[in-house]
């Protein structure tokens, strides 16, 4: 009932969270990389042959799995993509043991260097219910991200919070936003929202929402497709 009331509440008194942050302009990394991103398939990949074709015979440097991927989908993914080319995090609908069951390392909180580009990640979503699932309160995400080294690209399941729309499931995490500002991160790639769009924060960070399967090409530190 609480969530229903929050969803139905009009979008009034919205807080512009970005306006509370010091506007540190991003540090561009001026390098190229192609990322195959998979997020929020929820079992659709195993049922959709056209979707499966998107991961056949394409060139990319790294496959980034951003969470909410069904078991059947993982079976398809691992038939087509070698594990050594995959980094994966959990979404809010994933069980904690999922990645281990499929022999994948949990990339949550880790950083990898690809083509001289540092890529890090944070799993899960804002903790909007009491049950245990991959999630953070705003306070927990503060402590988690403070321990992460500087990165050029931050992968996440949830989005950065920009406005408080009183929608705890999809508003995002404040401290993803603060991390992007404080560390001057040029790019954030996330899932969770079930839309595909490219946006930009006020400090210049490009924010790319991935839905299902998308190949993202980055040229000279900017997303171009």
State the predicted function of each range.
Residues 78-79, 85-88, 164-225:
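Conserved beta-sheet core of the metallophosphoesterase superfamily
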Residues 42-49, 69-75, 92-99, 112-113, ...:
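Active-site environment of divalent metal-dependent phosphoester hydrolases
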Residues 49-57, 113-115, 142-148, 219-224:
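Short amphipathic alpha-helix with an adjacent loop that forms part of the alpha/beta core around
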């Amino acid at each position: 009932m609480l969530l229903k009331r929050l969803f139905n509440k009009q979008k009034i008194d919205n807080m512009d969270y970005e306006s509370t942050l010091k506007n540190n302009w991003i540090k561009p990394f001026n390098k190229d990389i192609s990322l195959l991103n998979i997020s929020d398939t929820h079992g659709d990949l195993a049922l959709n042959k056209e979707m499966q074709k998107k991961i056949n015979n394409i060139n990319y440097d790294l496959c980034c799995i951003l969470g909410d991927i069904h078991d059947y989908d993982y079976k398809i993914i691992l038939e087509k993509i070698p594990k050594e080319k995959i980094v994966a995090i959990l979404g809010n609908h994933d069980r904690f043991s999922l990645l281990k069951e499929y022999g994948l390392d949990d990339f949550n909180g880790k950083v990898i260097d690809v083509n001289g580009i540092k890529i890090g990640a944070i799993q899960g979503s804002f903790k909007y219910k009491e049950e245990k699932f991959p999630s953070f309160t705003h306070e927990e995400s503060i402590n988690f991200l403070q321990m992460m080294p500087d990165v050029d690209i931050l992968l996440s399941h949830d989005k950065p919070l920009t406005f408080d729309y009183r929608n705890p499931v999809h508003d995002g995490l404040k401290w993803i936003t603060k991390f992007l500002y404080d560390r001057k991160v040029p790019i954030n790639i996330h899932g969770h929202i079930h839309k595909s769009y490219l946006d930009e924060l006020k400090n210049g960070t490009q924010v790319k929402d991935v839905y299902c399967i998308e190949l993202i090409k980055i040229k000279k530190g900017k997303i171009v497709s």
